[in-house]
């Protein structure tokens, strides 16, 4: 039977690390991202099937249903994200709407579309929040509000979709990635950011992916509705 894990945002730091870790464990995956060249390269490296998709276009679900029609879905990891940092006075309504669609609305459409598939496979869904959803950081109003909504969605769907579908959420702190590189443009910035974390280093995609892999595994089938920090200690002991 064609059983696979579906990885959204597969070409990003966390997504690509998760793909690698699942490959190491000989798990089959279907990769989804919007950058055609990067996605084709990743697919070629691991021999996985893929779909090119921009989740900001809500019509994407219809095509995905066709692409994944023959796949039995063991789990979904929604490793899609953004870094929307600006002073509140500079924000516009479209900033909040775009972030909410990317982080919340799109994943609700995905879960609805594949709910029955996940249910018959006792599947797992892993979502992603941020440490900033619970801690107040300057200039984070856009992303904090969208990710706080993801945390609410996690616990609500965990209750509603039990016992056959597990929903959990990972809340990282700042992680090294293509979209965060602008924050690490000099050593002083790096040192300042590292020192905000008790473990005194920046997070990496593999740090987050390790927990995502754990939560996707059917061996951990008594965990649902959890928001778990992978943040170098920043949320609780910084």
Where are these regions (language model features)?
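N-terminal Rossmann NAD(P)H-binding glycine-rich loop of SDR-like oxidoreductase domains
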Residues: 11, 19
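Catalytic Tyr-X3-Lys loop
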Residues: 82, 89-109, 126, 143, ...
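Active-site loop-to-helix junction immediately N-terminal to the catalytic Tyr of the SDR YXXXK motif
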Residues: 136-144, 156
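Alpha-helical segment proximal to the catalytic Tyr-Lys
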Residues: 116, 158-163
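Short, small/polar-rich loop/turn modules that mediate ligand/substrate recognition or access, typified
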Residues: 162-166, 223-225
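Short C-terminal tail/terminal secondary-structure segment
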Residues: 135, 213, 224-238
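A conserved structural motif in NAD(P)-dependent oxidoreductases
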Residues: 197-208
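Residue(s) in the substrate-gating loop at a strand-loop-helix junction
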Residues: 130
